[in-house]
Amino acid sequence: MAISQISVFVENRPGRLADITAVLAKNSIDIRALSVADTSDYGILRLIVNDPKSAVEALRSEGMTASVTQVLGIIIPDEPGGLARAIKVLSDAQISVEYAYAFITPSVGNAYVIIRVEDNDKASEILKGAGIELIEQDDIFKK
């Protein structure tokens, strides 16, 4: 149930994010979620897109450094404590979350959270056992 996430190396300079998103738009790539982690010189742009393979090919053809990482997507109630419950389930199983970011869903009352863990299979099993629903790549783009 892993989701393919695109990671793009981004130099910290004006216009770089615009360049990346323009390449994706030109190639009909739909961005559903993104997160930027930065340092003083560069950042990592993480994206959930409708066609990860084509996105990476398009970015690389423009000389950009891009790769695919497998992450998990979970559905949480859009209410106080919804995320805390899912994270506690992982913590209780000694699974560390390397990073996470959330975005809205077309489903009223829920949110999607992307999480990066060391062992997707183990985390999936633990989350499912606790009644936490996982999502697949195609689910993210259903209207």
Question: Predicted regions: what is each one?
Answer:
Residues 1-143:
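A conserved regulatory-domain signal marking ACT and ACT-like small-molecule sensing domains
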